[in-house]
Amino acid sequence: MTKALVVYGTRYGATANTSEAIADVLRKEGFEVRVVNAKEDKVQSISEYELIIVGSGIKMGRWTKEPEKFLEKFQKELAKKKLALFVCCGAAHPLTEEEEKTREMEDARRKYLEEKAAKYDLNPVALGLFGGVYDFNKMSWFFRKTMSAVKPKLEEAGFKETEAGLYDTRDLNAIRSWAKEVAKMVDSQT
C-alpha cells in the first residue's frame, strides 16, 4: 500500500477541509494517508512516505508559515519524493472582469506554486490552485474592513453566504478530480 502524507497550514479552515477531501480520495484509491496540520503536529521524518502533498492557505499574498517551514526543513528529501503542492486562495476565483480572470489565475499559479517549488528546488508532480473561504467572522477588524468591498463582488460572482459572514469559493469536485489525478500519476510511476 502506497503511503501518503498530506501536510497543510490553514487560517480559516479551508485548507484543512481541502486536505481531508484530498486524503479521502487517496484512501479510496488505495493509499494509506496521514493528514497533518503543520501548526499542531511537527513531522519528524518523511522517509516512510512515497507521496507528499503540501498545502497552504494564502492571505495577503503569503503562504502560512508552518508548511513553508516544512518545505525548508525537508527540502533535500522532498526533491527525491513524489510531491504535490496546492493552495487555497481567492485568486483561484478572481472577482474581476472575465478577460482578467485567466491572467490573475495564471499569476497566482506562478507566484504561489511554481515560484514556491523553485525556491526550494523542487519538481512537483502536480500543482493545485483551489478557491478559499472568506470567513468575515474570524478576520481581524482591520482585515474585515479592508475586505468589505469583496462581499458584493463575491455575491455578483455567484458565491452566497453558506453561514453568516462565510463565503466558500472552493469547487470540491475539482479538488477531488485533482487528487484522483495525483493518485494516478503516482501509481503509474511506482
What do the PLM-derived regions correspond to, one by one?
Residues 32-42:
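A short glycine-rich beta-strand->turn/loop micro-motif centered on a GG-aromatic cluster
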Residues 1-5, 36, 183:
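A generic structural signal for ordered secondary structure
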Residues 29, 34, 51, 59-190:
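FMN-binding flavodoxin-like domain, especially the glycine-rich phosphate-binding loop
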Residues 2-31:
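N-terminal beta1-alpha1 ligand-phosphate binding loop
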Residues 42-43, 63:
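Short, well-ordered alpha-helical microsegments
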Residues 47-48:
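Alpha-helix C-terminal capping/helix-to-coil transition sites in glycosyltransferase folds
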